[in-house]
């Protein structure tokens, strides 16, 4: 396919984007808005953003959800801007500096919350800055400007949603159904690999792929939830399926690890049974029926606990899968499964990374302020806005540098494109609303195609072009003002890119160590006799951390294996029959405090000291278990955990 070719699957979204732009333009001028440009720009960004992220037409609900986040972010930013202006209107410089800190603060929060919701906080940061900068000539018009900006943005969002609904958005339900079938087959094949106990690298690749696919399925669940309320029952089932899928991975990998020391636990009966190849979900269904008969025949005591738990989880997975596909009413058996343990939310391991993002955004905005005041350039304010936009939106993404480059390319492409519209097209079409709409529809159509291809600079070009062409009411054509706006965008993006390069993010190793220590804490905290604590479901949170670790350190198998071993230890200790008495309960609390100190320690020396203390406490704990005559189901996992921590103590404590 050539660079300028148009694929059939890209046409529908391109028409959808063009329609959103035209609707926003028409409504903006019809209601005599002062700057319809904001409505058009909002419609374009809300519609095109999910398409750029997805690399194609977004699924149903994605545009609505992004629009909802944009409304929330805009209102938070407007309120913050009004508060800052009211409090500091007599000190303009201090007011702008506080706005720069506010933008950094919002970026810091956006780095800690769920990535789907980070967009709202990034938007809140630069919206306040836009308001403060824009009202500098006439500060008394602040409330009016804030209300107008909110109105224009809401109109743009409504137009984007209307265009999305008009062109029948894609439903993700069929993709979810197919993935559920395929994932079950992959889970069975992973168990086959683990029972064969073959090449470790093949097993590592298999479970790593399954972790990614399970995480992707969770993302599909979020999309399905946004799509329509009629999928509420399917959404509940999918949430439980996420935990079941992670349980299947854990039990399979534990089966593999057990055979490193005690291969005799997996009898020939089960080895022969799992030799039968499977290709479809129907094959897995038949095998599971046979496997349940085998377990009923051999008895629970003669069945390895990992295989028994795996079969139970796979059976529940199958039951819920059928319910998701049919979307029927939840029956009593399913309700019992869905009334599972409450999920635990863990503290973010990226606090240092979030602080780096805070300083990047704050310093770049302050640098823009100094540049504006030093040069006295009329478009210095425009440069500041672009700095805030780039840093606020780029920081949460995996590669902020490439996002900044995308904006630079986009603003450079917007200069000749905007020049064509400013000098030729708009002056010749402003007398006809139809021609003006057609001209912008053409722009939206072709850039909509490029956005779906994720062409470098396409998203930035779309937003920057709309931002600099004259879409005000009434239209005025001042070439110097156009040129200043275009150059201001470019300078702002370059300054933001410079700050991103200068303020290096060296938090990766620290984040990795914090993640590993959080796995240790989870394993230690599983040693408890508290009934409520034992019922807590840590598995989704632990695998979410593992997924983050895999993204931060691609290809680092020792780290992945260590993390997975800690997850397995947590699950085994959580179900272990620990003797209930006050002596052990008090020692459990002491070990949790020590493990927490390991995570929160700010220096390597303190971390090593607390980690050494934790190892000593584990030795004492093993002695206590012997005194209280704990069964092997307790002593063996604790012994394995202590051995793992001794083996990897340098990786868990050194920066």
UniProtKB/Swiss-Prot annotation:
Residues crossing the lipid bilayer are 13-33, 38-58, 69-89, 93-113, 121-141, 152-172, 370-390, 407-427, 431-451, 459-479, 482-502
InterPro entries, per database record: PHBA_efflux_AaeB/fusaric-R, PHBA_efflux_pump_AaeB
State whether keyword Transport applies: yes
Per its database record, what is this protein's job? Forms an efflux pump with AaeA. Could function as a metabolic relief valve, allowing to eliminate certain compounds when they accumulate to high levels in the cell.
NCBIfam families listed in its UniProt record: PRK10631.1 (NF007916)
- Keywords from the UniProt entry: Cell inner membrane, Cell membrane, Membrane, Transmembrane, Transmembrane helix, Transport
GO CC entries: plasma membrane
The GO annotation for biological process reads: carboxylic acid transport
Q: Where in the cell is it found?
A: Cell inner membrane
* A GO molecular-function descriptor: transmembrane transporter activity
User: Where does this chain mainly localize?
Assistant: membrane
Membrane topology category: Multi-pass membrane protein
Its domain of life? Answer: Bacteria
Q: Name one Pfam family in it.
A: FUSC
Note the SS bond partners: none
Record's protein name: p-hydroxybenzoic acid efflux pump subunit AaeB
The similarity comment for this entry is:
Belongs to the aromatic acid exporter ArAE (TC 2.A.85) family.
């Amino acid at each position: 396919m050539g660079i300028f070719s148009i694929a059939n699957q890209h046409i529908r979204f391109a028409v959808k984007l063009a329609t959103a732009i035209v609707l926003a333009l028409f409504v903006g001028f019809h209601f005599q808005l002062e700057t319809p440009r904001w409505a058009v720009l909002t419609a374009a960004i809300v519609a095109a953003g999910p398409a750029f992220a997805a690399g194609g037409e977004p699924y149903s609900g994605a545009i609505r959800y992004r629009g909802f986040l944009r409304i929330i972010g805009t209102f938070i930013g407007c309120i913050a801007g009004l508060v800052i202006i009211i409090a500091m209107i007599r000190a303009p410089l201090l007011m702008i500096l506080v706005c720069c800190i506010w933008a950094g603060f919002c970026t810091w929060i956006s780095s800690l919350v769920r990535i789907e919701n980070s967009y709202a906080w990034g938007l809140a940061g630069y919206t306040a800055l836009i308001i403060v900068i824009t009202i500098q000539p006439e500060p008394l018009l602040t409330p009016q400007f804030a209300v107008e900006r909110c109105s224009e943005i809401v109109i743009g969002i409504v137009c984007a949603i209307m265009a999305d609904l008009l062109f029948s958005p894609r439903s993700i339900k069929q993709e979810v159904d197919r993935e559920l079938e395929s994932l079950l087959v992959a889970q069975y094949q992973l168990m086959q690999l683990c029972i064969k106990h073959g090449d470790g690298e093949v097993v590592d690749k298999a479970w790593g792929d399954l972790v990614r696919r399970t995480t992707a399925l969770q993302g599909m669940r979020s999309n399905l939830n946004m799509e329509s309320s009629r999928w509420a029952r399917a959404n509940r089932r999918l949430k439980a399926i996420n935990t079941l899928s992670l349980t299947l991975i854990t039990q399979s990998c534990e089966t593999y690890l057990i055979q490193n020391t005690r291969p005799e636990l997996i009898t020939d009966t089960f080895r022969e049974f799992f030799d039968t190849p499977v290709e479809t979900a129907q094959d897995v269904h038949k095998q599971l029926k046979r496997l349940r008969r085998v377990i009923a025949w051999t008895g629970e005591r003669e069945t390895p606990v990992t295989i028994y738990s795996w079969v139970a989880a796979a059976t529940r997975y199958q039951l819920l899968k059928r319910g998701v596909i049919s979307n029927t009413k939840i029956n009593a058996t399913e309700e019992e499964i869905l009334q599972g343990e409450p999920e635990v939310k863990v503290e973010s391991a990226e606090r240092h990374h979030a602080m780096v993002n805070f300083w990047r955004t704050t310093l770049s905005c302050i640098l823009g302020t100094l540049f504006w005041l030093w040069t006295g350039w009329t478009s210095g304010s425009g440069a500041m806005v672009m700095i805030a936009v780039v840093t606020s939106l780029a920081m949460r993404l995996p590669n902020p540098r490439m996002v900044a480059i995308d904006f630079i390319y986009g603003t450079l492409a917007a200069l000749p494109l905007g020049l064509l519209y400013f000098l030729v097209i708009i002056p010749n079409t402003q007398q006809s609303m139809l021609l003006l709409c057609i001209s912008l529809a053409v722009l939206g159509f072709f850039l909509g195609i490029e956005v779906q291809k994720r062409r470098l600079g396409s998203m930035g070009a779309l937003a920057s072009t709309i931002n600099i062409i004259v879409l005000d009411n009434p239209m005025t054509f001042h070439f110097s003002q156009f040129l200043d706006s275009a150059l201001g965008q470019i300078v702002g993006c370059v300054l933001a890119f410079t700050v991103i390069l200068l303020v290096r993010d060296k938090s990766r190793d620290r984040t990795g160590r914090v993640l590993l220590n959080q796995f240790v804490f989870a394993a230690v905290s599983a040693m408890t006799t508290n009934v409520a604590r034992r019922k807590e479901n840590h598995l989704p949170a632990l695998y979410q951390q593992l997924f983050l670790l895999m993204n931060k350190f691609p290809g680092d198998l020792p780290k992945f294996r260590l993390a997975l071993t800690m997850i397995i230890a947590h699950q085994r200790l959580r179900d272990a029959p620990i003797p209930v008495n006050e002596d052990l309960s008090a020692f459990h609390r002491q070990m949790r405090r020590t493990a927490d100190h390991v995570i929160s320690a700010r220096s390597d020396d303190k971390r090593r000291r607390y980690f050494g203390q934790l190892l000593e406490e584990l030795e004492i704990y093993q002695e206590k278990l012997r005194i209280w005559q704990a069964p092997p189901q307790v002593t063996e996992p604790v012994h394995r955990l202590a051995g793992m921590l001794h083996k990897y103590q340098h990786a868990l404590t050194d920066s």
